Amino acid sequence: MEAFRTHTGIGVPLRRSNVDTDQIIPAVYLKRVTRTGFEDGLFAAWRNDPSFVLNLAPFDKGSVLVAGPDFGTGSSREHAVWALMDFGFRVVISSRFADIFRGNAGKAGLLAAEVSQDDVELLWKLIEQHPGTEITVNLQDRTITAGTMMVLFNIDDYTAWRLLEGLDDIGLTLRKLDEIEDYERHRPEWKPHTLPA
């Protein structure tokens, strides 16, 4: 997983609350066996509307989604995070995330930045009045900057550390590779062994 330090990209206003994982990517798009190629299913029902924000320039090139409260509710669907990332999003900003979505996002490298709803409203106003406004998100400082506006965001320390280090679950496991190999070397012969890489 690529480490996340800072990201600058066009802000996209998604003025919707309670966006669940089935709205992010409907179940019909979950039949792939790979982890990529899900961008075509992102907000599929809404993208049929030509006036939907992701169908409008410059928002169609955005990488920082500014969403309403309770983003990512519903089922635990890693595909929702993958679809957002496949489309090009690196950050989702909201006043409230579903716990499971927040966890899936952090494990995949998507930053879920939590701010107050007042700050969401100010960001929406700014990027709607000035389409193409770039938003810079600095994970180290936990700041979001857009134009003259600067706000702090919340993220738990553990998820922030994983993102800064670029550690997904496999990366975390590989940090203990010497200990794992030592354990395997000292296991009794009659117990099952893992095959060497």
From Swiss-Prot:
CDD domains found in the cross-reference section: IPMI_Swivel
Family matches, as InterPro entries: 3-IsopropMal_deHydase_ssu, Aconitase/3IPM_dehydase_swvl, AconitaseA/IPMdHydase_ssu_swvl, IPMI_Swivel, LeuD
Disulfide bonds: none
Keyword Lipid metabolism on entry: no
Reactions listed under catalytic activity: (2R,3S)-3-isopropylmalate = (2S)-2-isopropylmalate
Family: Belongs to the LeuD family. LeuD type 1 subfamily.
Assembly information from the UniProt record: Heterodimer of LeuC and LeuD.
This protein's name: 3-isopropylmalate dehydratase small subunit
Organism: Mycolicibacterium vanbaalenii (strain DSM 7251 / JCM 13017 / BCRC 16820 / KCTC 9966 / NRRL B-24157 / PYR-1) (Mycobacterium vanbaalenii)
